[in-house]
Amino acid sequence: MSTFLPPLAPGSVSLRLYPHTSLDARAIVEEMRTQARLAREVGFDGVMTSEHHGGFAGYLPNPLQMAGFLLEAMDGGWAGACPLLLTVRPTALVVEETAWLAARFPGRVMLGVAAGSLQDDFDILETPKEGYVERFKSALPQVAGALSGRDPWLLGGDPAVAACAHSPIPMTSAAMSYTAVRRAADAGMGLLFDSLSTIERCRELTDTYRGSGGTGTCILVRRVWIGPPPASRQAQQVDVYRSYAEAGAQTHWADDAMLSHSDPAELAEIVANTAAAAGCEAVNIRLHVPGILPEEVRDQLAALGDVVPAVRERLLAGLAV
C-alpha cells in the first residue's frame, strides 16, 4: 500500500507493536520489522512503540530507536515512540533525537510522550521519581515548542530542530486527567487514551480538551481481535497494569475494553462507533497480550485486512458530518 494518512491525522488507523520476549533480541527486532511491513500491507497508516525498562512486561527501553528500525522496513507509512517517558531523560535529547529521525524520514515521524509511573523505570535510569510530575510539566511545552517549530528553545542552532519550523513533527500526550488534557491543549499536542479507560471517561476528557482550546487529534487505543477474544490472556495483561498504575486511574478502567467480532464489517463498525462515542478522531489498535505468538499476530494482521480500511472510511465519514 503506497498511500497513507499523515502521522496522527484525523481518520488515521495505527497499530501498537510490542516485542515477543520469548525470542532473542535479534529475532525480536526482525519480527517487529516484519509485523510493521505486514501492518502497512493491510492498510494501517502507521505504527507506534512504547517504553518501559528492564524487560518489563514486553515493552522496549528504546522506542524511538525501534521506530527508526521499523521505518526502514516499511513501504511508506509512519512510526514513532508513543508514548516515550519524558521524565527519565534530558528534554533536549528527546527533541534532538526525534528531529534527526524526522530528517531521515521526512513526514513519517511522530512523537507521543508520557510522565511515567513505574518505579523501576526511574531506578534503572538512576532518575528520582520524586518531582516527576513537575519535570513533565516543565518539559512538555519545551518539547512541543521545539518540534512544532514555534520555539526552538536552546536548540535553534541544530539543523534538524530548525527544520521543524517548516516541517513540524506531530505530537500527542498520554493524558488521563482533566489537568493533563488541559496541559496538552496549552502545548498544542493531541491526546492518546489508554486501552483500558472507559468510553465515558475518554469522552469527558475529550470534551474538556476541546473546551480548553485543544485542536489536536484525539486517539483512542483499543485491543481489537477477529474471532473469539483471548480473554484469559487479556486478564493477565490487566493484572500487570494493576501492579503499578495509580489507584485513581484504575477507577476509570472498563471491565472489558477489548473489541472483538468474527465478521470484519461488524468489527469495523464497532471500532469506529467506539471511537466516535469517545470523541476521538483516530484509532490505535493493539493485538498484543501476554504469551501471544508471532504467528498469532501475523494471522490477526491478515484478518484485519478488511477491517482497517473500513474503520478509516467510517472515521473520515464521521468527520465530514
Outline where the language-model segments fall.
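N-terminal beta1-alpha1-beta2 module of alpha/beta enzyme domains
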Residues: M1-M74, I169
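An alpha-helical appendage that flanks or caps ligand/catalytic pockets
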Residues: S2-A9, E41, L125, E130-A160, ...
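Internal, glycine-rich beta/alpha segment that forms the wall or movable "lid"
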Residues: S2-G11, P90-G190, I199-D207
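Alpha-helix-loop-beta-strand connector modules within alpha/beta enzyme cores
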Residues: F4-P10, A57-L84, R135-A139, A302-L319
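Structural preference for beta-strand elements that scaffold enzyme active sites
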Residues: P10-R16, D45-G46, W78-P83, R108-G112, ...
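Active-site mouth loops of central-metabolism enzymes
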Residues: L15-E30, P83-A92, A165-A175, A254-A265
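Short, acidic/polar
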Residues: R26-L38, E97, A175-R182, P264-T274
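Conserved, mostly hydrophobic/aromatic
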Residues: A39, G43, E51, L70, ...
